[in-house]
Amino acid sequence: MKKLKLEINVSHFVVTLYDKILENITRDFLSPYWSYKFEYNKNIRRAIRVKDKPFFVNYLDEDNHEVYRLHKSLLKPYLGYIGANGKISSDTVELINNTKTKHGNYANIEFDHKKFTLRDYQERISKSVLENPEHFSMINLNVGLGKSLTACYILSELKTKIAIVILSKYLEKWEEDVLKHYPNMKDRYIVIQGGDALRDLMVNAEEYKKKYDIFIFSIRTLMNYINVYDNRKGDVFLLKEYPVAPENFIQRLGIGAFLNDESHQEPGSVSKILLYFQCDFYLLLTATFNSNDPHTVKMYKMLVPERLRFNLETDRGNYIKVNNVRYYIEKAPKLRHQTNQGYSQVLFEQSILSRPYLLAQFDKMVLKYVERDYIEKRKPGYKCLVYAATVDMCKHLMVVLRKEYPKLTVNTYVQEDDYQNLMTSDITASTPGSAGVGVDIPYLSTIIQTISMGSLQANRQMMGRLRKIDGVDTTYTALYCGNLRKHKDLYKQRETCTKDFAKEWRYETYRPNAWESELKLR
């Protein structure tokens, strides 16, 4: 009698359980594979870590059997675990191996070799990825080293239809990349965003398959769809809001290659999509697939084992000059900056914005470093990016900078702002969520960082917006409050995770004037 069915695919495997004992054993095995979040506990009056989202999928099939979809890296550990605890053998397992089954249709996607030439390290990485027998890889290059270019070349070599799965804020960027790298794809790609567009794609799959070779999907659109199918029980599922189950969706379009950019940003969503979509080849891109949280590192290794990550073996050469500017605020600890879950930059900025006298001094400080590190060194076309945590602070700084530099183009890039704001402005005020990851700003020479944060990923990504410009010292000026304990702690964390990035690492103290050493509250 069969106790389970095991279906092995390129990126994942699917287990259907016919034995009740194996259901409990499987749940025990998967108990560590969750993401966590912090919630405030009223009883103990502090934030505690609680389970958030699983890095696996579980539902009931039509015969009420438990089905689990797990990442490929867990195959051997899982079989070993249930073998030791569930007394299974080859006679009790129904095995289906899909890793040799070809899902993708041919597509003549041509890379523009006349316009783009791969560097030596890009050629080496491309060769390693294309020769990887597991057909599942991550390009883990530092920012500015051409992940998108390398990925576009690799995908063109596969000669199959492509799914590009990205956050909605990167849709425009990847449209540009497709047109730039694939000159023969001008009328052969489509962007799918929103439930109506996705349903139409499912209903008219054959028509779309004939017309397009590259499908660019919004992650949020796909997750709204997949979440419906996570609940395969009762009347809710029978309504079938989407006519095709996610495990059958990609094959209907003849897609053979899967690409995801900035994979570190929503690993839970990327994980779930990988557990459903069946392709012949998978490629993930990120510069910072690391964390200062050990549990997150463990989940990353489960999602993409280190042997499948391809990057440089030599140092990339540091080129960023970092200025660490310590300033002081009168009675700084009295400013609101703490929540139940710890430090909040949002509250800190709101505290400054609510005090006009303090805000004017803060503005003066920001203007000093924009003037020194950008204006005085500026050449035509060079750009400056100012980071703040809140939209309100970004808009305020935009007004201040426009008044100070009326001849320059100064804008925000937040929320609904057009992508061209970021590309064409001389000075842009933006948030980490809008301009911290996944955007390449031509001739960005200076960043003024007003945010204090300890995240390894966020700090490296924001600093990495600065690309190397021959003959120019790119400058990253980071401000932090020297008499606010949390700011000092976060500075030390930033130093730990970014000092290796810097060509120079300098320290200085800001003084409002010759006779004062701190910003006054009033």
Annotate each language-model stretch with its function:
Residues 114-135:
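N-terminal pre-P-loop "Q-motif" helix
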Residues 209-231, 238, 423-437:
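Conserved two-lobed SF2 helicase motor
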Residues 143, 148-153, 157-183, 389-394:
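Conserved Walker A/P-loop ATP-binding site and its immediately adjacent core
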Residues 387-414:
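Conserved helicase motor "Helicase C" RecA-like lobe of SF1/SF2 P-loop NTPases
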Residues 253-257, 262-324:
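Post-DEXD/H (motif II) to motif III coupling segment of the RecA-like Helicase ATP-binding lobe
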